[in-house]
């Protein structure tokens, strides 16, 4: 299943084509839209927002039953819900959290493969690069930063990411072995100590799902 904003339509097409080329039997696209989402929260009554439609629950169960891999592409405007009633947002989040609990558990326990990626959305790009000469330049600059972060500019991006993931895993393994009781952060104006519970677990950039597949 692919969750992606309508603004990223062309990227969605590329992802769907590649998924089928790699052997996917079905690619379900769950479109998101900042404008439609905002209008819903501004105008829908509370009794509608704190209830999750049965079709959404049925879709979740369908995805779980078929052990569907999940890819979330995030590009939303960080300020899309500015000014929206906080009680409405809270009620909706609580309802979704309860109804989608099976999916959350399956994801957190890596019973299915999942990942989250970023795409350059216009409103997001304008907030990150407010001094860009044009909207197009702002989006290009944000894509550039995303590509750098994801090693896209490397000669072999996949190998570069695998090497990065291996480094992260080695760090996580070390932290799990040490089992520090706390983390102490210091900087100008900062002196923060965060306690850690016994038997805490550090994770990195990769995992193995219940079917023994790496992701």
Each model region followed by its residue ranges:
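Active-site bordering "gate/hinge" segments
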Residues: 2-215
């Amino acid at each position: 299943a692919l969750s992606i904003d309508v603004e990223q339509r062309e990227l969605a097409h590329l992802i769907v084509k590649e998924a089928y080329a790699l052997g996917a039997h079905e690619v379900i696209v769950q479109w998101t839209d900042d404008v439609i989402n905002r209008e819903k929260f501004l105008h829908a009554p509370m009794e509608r927002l704190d209830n999750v439609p049965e079709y959404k629950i049925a879709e979740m169960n369908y995805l779980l039953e078929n052990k569907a891999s999940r890819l979330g592409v995030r590009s939303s405007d960080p300020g899309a819900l500015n000014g929206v009633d906080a009680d409405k947002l809270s009620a909706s989040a609580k309802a979704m959290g309860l109804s989608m609990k099976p999916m959350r558990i399956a994801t957190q326990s890596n019973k299915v493969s999942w990942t989250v990626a970023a795409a350059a959305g216009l409103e997001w790009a304008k907030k990150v690069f407010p001094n860009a000469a044009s909207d197009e330049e702002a989006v290009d600059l944000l894509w550039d930063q995303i590509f750098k972060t994801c090693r896209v500019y490397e000669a072999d991006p996949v190998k570069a990411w695998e090497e990065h993931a291996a480094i992260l895993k080695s760090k996580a393994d070390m932290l799990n072995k040490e089992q520090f009781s706390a983390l102490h952060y210091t900087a100008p104006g900062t002196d923060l100590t965060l306690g850690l519970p016994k038997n805490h677990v550090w994770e990195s950039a990769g995992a193995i799902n219940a079917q023994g597949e790496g992701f």
